Amino acid sequence: MLKKVVLISGGAAVGKTAVLKNIIPLLQSKDLALSVCKIDCVATRDGLVYQNINIPHVVGISGDICPDHFLVSNLPELYHWADEKQSDVLLIETAGLCHRCSPATEQMAAGCVLDCTSSCHAPAQLGPMLTYADFVVLTKIDMVSQAEREIILWKIKELNPTAKLFTVDGLTGYGAEGLADWLSCFSKETNF
């Protein structure tokens, strides 16, 4: 029975799939049955990533609809699918263009993935995707200085003081263990 839903959102090429690829085996090592839903706008090859690591997955292409609106309109079917797969945790990866579709995030652990190389001003441009996030993941941390990373972390804390912050290197997996541990313990009231 589905116990937890984790929403991973962020712009194109920020490393959402790389983060998931690193935390999936860590969550599975905690005896959690996982499934993944990938929602993209036009096309994606990320389904192959999940197929290669042998995890139940489904891909949705939103087309001319915002990926978040597409997600909300398909949530009942998605929960049913995850239940059929006997998943404890459903991981949803979305482009999250508007991320304003509450109640989608009310019963989910909502996460925002941000690329450190984008700019120290990027967090302010993410709007609700960042300000309503339960956790924020910084990627490409190896490509910026410690000082730049601290400035970005400070900007994020300024915009969302309650979000838990993680730095994850999508290539090496550095930092993924802390995120996986936190996600396995994090809980919200759920009524799927």
Each predicted region: which residue ranges?
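Short, glycine/polar-rich helix-capping loops at beta-to-alpha or helix-loop-helix junctions
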Residues: 44-47, 121-126, 148-155
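G-domain G4 guanine-recognition motif of GTPases
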Residues: 10-12, 41, 116, 133-148, ...
